[in-house]
């Protein structure tokens, strides 16, 4: 826990005081790093189990200055089932709180549904996607429409060409 307060504990306490909630929504801007999606799913599952109702974690997507956000929003149920939105894609996740199978993704890519004993696997392409999204969003937000590449033939040039062509 990176915070002085514990919002999940506070919501649990409200429940003890008679407050009834159908779900909890967390609007997040959690920066990307390798294996972050597994941590995010574990946090959402833990929150849903503690709260005894669905926990929805909506995460930002795209590049913002020197930070990258992979999206991958999560809906977790108290039984550990989780629905995960696609990485690096903007879209709308429509939640059906009664059934993971009823959730709908409007956008590119597809939802993943994980059973309570399944872990999310970070895709091997995540790092490349992060670099491409970061460079693309930086150029778009900075008004850069053309880039000149100086290529020497080394591995770094091959990587630069690969990113530029994506």
What is the predicted role of each segment?
Residues 154:
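Conserved G/P- and acidic residue-centered "switch" motifs that form tight phosphate/ATP-binding loops
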């Amino acid at each position: 826990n990176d915070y002085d307060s514990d919002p999940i504990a506070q919501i649990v306490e409200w429940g003890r005081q008679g407050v009834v909630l159908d779900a909890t929504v967390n609007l997040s801007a959690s920066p990307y790093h390798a294996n972050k999606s597994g941590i995010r799913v574990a946090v959402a599952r833990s929150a849903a189990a503690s709260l005894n109702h669905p926990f929805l974690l909506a995460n930002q997507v795209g590049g913002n200055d020197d930070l990258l956000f992979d999206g991958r929003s999560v809906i977790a149920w108290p039984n550990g089932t989780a629905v995960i939105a696609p990485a690096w894609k903007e879209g709308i996740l429509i939640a059906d709180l009664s059934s993971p199978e009823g959730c709908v993704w409007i956008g590119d890519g597809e939802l993943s549904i994980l059973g309570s004993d399944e872990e999310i696997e970070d895709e091997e392409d995540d790092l490349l996607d992060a670099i491409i999204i970061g460079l693309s969003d930086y150029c778009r937000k900075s008004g850069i429409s053309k880039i000149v590449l100086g290529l020497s033939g080394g591995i770094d040039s091959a990587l630069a060409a690969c990113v530029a062509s994506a």
